[in-house]
Amino acid sequence: MVEAKLILTLFHILGTVLGVGGATMAEIFFLKAIRDGVIDPIETSFLRTTYSVIRIGLFIIIFSGIGYLLLYRLTGVDWYLLSDKYWAKMSITLIILLNAVLIQMRSIPMWLGGAISLTSWYFAMFLGIWRGLDMTFSEILGVYVAAVLIVAYVLHLIKKIMCERYKKCKI
């Protein structure tokens, strides 16, 4: 079972790296693309490629997460499956998935979708790294919602500064 856990961990880390890196680059490319007020075909291509990387990361996270679920269930590590941290990670993964669908359908403003994506991927990473986290599910999600709002505000400020500097984009 050690080998199975190692393989799952490697894939889970790979999915996280692709998701966090992709979300970061997507936001950078998006902000760079809108500074002149028009997203040209090359910028669109970069964004599509980056979103594909994020989707691959999400796919890997979901399937390695299902693998962890099965492994923990079969090896009797039920206590972890009942922890607040586990359910917070599952909730944030679901938010990443739903946000991706809403962005794809153009049913969510990009300022909000980008903030949710960026925050969610980093938050999921921190939850995976932070071994001794002692918070309830509600506390974790409260911090998460606050982080989404802060990231949305910071991204808005960055966009505002860029728009003032280049005088072509809209806020």
Which functions belong to the PLM regions below?
Residues 1-171:
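Polytopic transmembrane helical bundles with strong interfacial aromatic enrichment
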